[in-house]
Swiss-Prot record:
Disruption phenotype: No visible phenotype.
Gene Ontology terms: cellular component: membrane
Main location: membrane
Protein name per Swiss-Prot or TrEMBL: Transmembrane protein 234 homolog
Lineage: Eukaryota, Amoebozoa, Evosea, Eumycetozoa, Dictyostelia
Amino acid sequence: MDTYNIISLLLVGFIWGGTNPLIKRGSEGVSKVKKDNFLSQIIYEFVYLWTRPSYTIPMLINLSGSVVFFYTLSKVDISLVVPISNSLTFLFTSLMGMLLGEKVLHFKSYLGMIFVLAGVTICVSSKF
């Protein structure tokens, strides 16, 4: 695995993890949309979400992370891409949530992040 692929994996984790809390914030209020039947409910929820830039912009950025993910998947072994990108997504989601004031991270959260980084480092170094 070369440096470019490592950067791609970091980028996927950063994009996915960084946008998850923003998508959550942008989707606030969708549960208040109430319609009489199932199909109308789905349509109105879709319209509600996609007409709000606070949801749409982070979602589109998040989807661009999927493009980077699939590109990286074509270049790197799947046994590395999936666990590394998912682990880094968790890490960046936690950090972004903390930056946005969603929750205060405790010792166990930081310890978990250290373990994630150690695991990612082991996975990456095993392929050099």
